[in-house]
Design a protein with these regions (language model features):
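Short, charged/polar surface micro-motifs in flexible loops or helix N-caps
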Residues: 46-50, 58, 75-81
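Conserved catalytic-core motifs of GNAT/GCN5-like acyltransferases
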Residues: 7, 27-38, 96-101, 123-128
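Active-site beta-strand termini and strand-to-loop segments that position acidic
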Residues: 43-47, 109-114, 124
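Conserved beta-strand in the GNAT
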Residues: 51-54, 110, 120
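Core segments of cupin and vicinal oxygen chelate
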Residues: 8-49
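N-terminal beta-strand motif that seeds the catalytic metal site of vicinal oxygen chelate
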Residues: 1-17, 69-72, 125-128
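Acetyl-CoA-dependent GNAT
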Residues: 54-59, 124-127
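Vicinal oxygen chelate
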Residues: 13, 72-118
Length: 128
């Protein structure tokens, strides 16, 4: 058994792709319109696990604080550098960090994507 993908509703597919593909460097792998009339776009990093972004103008996203989704973690080489670069190049909000997480043996930071979804940037560190 393996995780294949996670699906997230978004308000603007192009803005979402600009962030995840353009700024974070993930790869767009597929796109189609589903039976629910939603535009579905898939992206992934180096692993086979994908993120599915769904958009339908008739779908109410709700407020970020009322969603049950907590966060998405993305591995990076340099948390501090990525935070600095993303804050310069995008409208992302830094929620917490960068900080050392000794329990996770990583340097982490929490930011937002264009729809307010929380993204954890994770730099694995053996020295923590």
């Amino acid at each position: 058994m393996d995780v294949i993908h996670s699906a997230i509703w978004v308000s603007d597919v192009e803005e979402t792709l600009d962030f995840y593909v353009g700024a974070l460097g993930l790869e767009k792998t597929n796109e189609f319109v589903g039976g629910d009339d939603a535009r579905n776009v898939y992206v992934r990093g180096e692993s086979e696990t994908e993120i599915q972004f769904k958009h339908n103008p008739d779908h109410d996203l709700g407020e970020p604080s009322t969603r049950r989704f907590d966060h998405l973690a993305i591995e990076v080489d340099d948390t501090d550098g990525e935070v600095e670069r993303l804050r310069e190049e995008t409208d992302t909000e830094l929620l917490r960090g960068p900080l050392d997480s000794t329990g996770a043996s990583a340097r982490v930071a929490f930011i937002t994507d264009p729809d307010g979804h929380v993204i954890e940037l994770v730099e694995p560190r053996e020295d923590l």
